[in-house]
Amino acid sequence: RRQRQMCIRDRKKRNLRIAVAKDEAFCFLYEDNLDYLRQSGCELTYFSPLKDSILPENIDGLLLYGGYPELHAEELSENISMREDIAGRIQSGLPCIAECGGFLYLHEYLETLDKEKYPMAGIIRGTGYNAGKLQRFGYMSVKAVKNTMLADKNQSFRAHEFPVSYTHLRA
């Protein structure tokens, strides 16, 4: 498996092209984060996990932000070509940052509040759930355990958390 270890602050090689999920299911984006990526020289290209059949071509990274995938679980599940493309590219080494709804989408299954279970991208072995209420709220400190697109190894930074979901992993 090929590993890509590029930091967005490293502009010596080339600009990075980042695919950003944006549609009715993935609509909770932080514009400040997107502005930071653009100011760092990244080209952002948007796609819809609901409507597009595959990811954009020639991308160096993938952002799956939050939203309401549980409200669109059936449609997301039916878009098999997109689910398979995302899974295949991540398994081939495409860096991906997924949060909240995007994290749920990467599971094998997503269970809705109505207890309906739908297949998703299958990167994370288990089922993601929307709890229907806030689990925690506040700020946290994060320390990178390896070089990533956003931080160097051992770099610490602050992050905001307000999860409304949880996961049951399987062995």
Please provide the spans of the model-predicted regions.
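Conserved small/polar residues in nucleotide/adenosyl-binding loops
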Residues: 3-10, 167-171
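C-terminal and late-domain segments of enzyme folds
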Residues: 13-14, 26-36, 43-45, 137-170
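Residues that mark the start of a beta-strand
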Residues: 15-17, 120
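Glycine-rich phosphate/diphosphate-binding loops and the adjacent beta-loop-alpha structural elements
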Residues: 19-23, 67-72
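Generic beta-strand/beta-sheet core signal
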Residues: 21, 47, 62-66, 99-100, ...
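Residue-level signal for short, function-critical loop segments
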Residues: 22-24, 127, 165
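Phosphate-binding active sites in nucleotide-utilizing proteins
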Residues: 28-65, 71
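Cysteine-nucleophile active-site neighborhood
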Residues: 69-149
